[in-house]
């Protein structure tokens, strides 16, 4: 990824565990040293855990909540001083949280329930709105994107078993393409998105509003 992005300009990479306070501090220090400030924060780290209700472990549930929700709160809180320094009324700093359509509706993948994932994303959407109100006075906007199904390591299992059902459930009858996420992130990060604040934007081909959703079978 670093090599690919470096084709467009200078780029740095740093591995960090955002659930760890020391790693978060190291990450923000790295950003400040390399860039001198921070104007865009994208909270994109995520985890999932699928299991039947009777077999769903407490530590698995906690891991997902900690990664998808608590770490977003903590990193955002810690990054606010840097974001504030870069922000102006005309060109606010941006926080973009990656939520999920599973935080909008109750998912129906009955064979692989993901209780913690959908709960964490619903909470993240509301945290986005809370942050938007709290940080507006500091000229920081906060929005969330709620993707539908895109190809990724996290979706490998469901694509292998249920891709046709996924496509049938989507009014556009297909899964998302990478450039369709790139476009909405670019909008929110650009001057065109400077007046957008506190929104949760679905990018799911209409799946979250489809009336024909049904349980999937093998």
Describe every region a protein language model picked out.
Residues 81, 133-134, 194:
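Alpha-helical segment proximal to the catalytic Tyr-Lys
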Residues 186, 197-218:
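Short C-terminal tail/terminal secondary-structure segment
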Residues 136, 141, 196-198:
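Short, small/polar-rich loop/turn modules that mediate ligand/substrate recognition or access, typified
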Residues 170-181:
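A conserved structural motif in NAD(P)-dependent oxidoreductases
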Residues 1-35, 48-49, 59-60:
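Short-chain dehydrogenase/reductase
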Residues 52-53, 57-65, 166:
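Substrate-binding pocket helix/loop in short-chain dehydrogenase/reductase
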Residues 87-123, 128-137:
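Catalytic loop of short-chain dehydrogenase/reductase
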């Amino acid at each position: 990824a670093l090599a690919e992005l470096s084709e467009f300009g200078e780029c740095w990479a740093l591995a960090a565990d955002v659930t760890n306070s020391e790693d978060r501090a190291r990450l923000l220090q790295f950003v400040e040293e390399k860039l001198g400030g921070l104007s865009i924060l994208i909270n994109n780290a995520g985890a999932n855990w699928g299991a039947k209700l009777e077999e769903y472990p407490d530590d698995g549930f906690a891991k997902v909540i900690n990664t998808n929700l608590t770490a977003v709160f903590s990193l955002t809180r810690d990054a606010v001083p840097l974001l504030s320094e870069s922000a102006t009324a005309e060109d606010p700093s941006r926080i973009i949280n990656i939520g999920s359509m599973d935080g909008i509706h109750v998912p129906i993948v009955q064979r692989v329930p993901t209780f913690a994932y959908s709960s964490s994303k619903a909470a993240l959407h509301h945290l986005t709105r809370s942050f938007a109100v709290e940080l507006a006075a500091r000229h920081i906007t906060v929005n969330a994107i709620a993707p539908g199904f895109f190809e990724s390591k996290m979706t490998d299992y469901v694509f292998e078993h249920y891709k046709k059902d996924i496509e049938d459930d989507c009014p556009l009858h297909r899964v998302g393409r990478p450039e369709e996420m790139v476009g909405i992130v670019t909008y929110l990060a650009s001057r065109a998105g400077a007046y957008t604040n506190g929104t949760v934007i679905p990018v799911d081909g209409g799946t979250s509003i489809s009336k024909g959703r049904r349980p999937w079978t093998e």
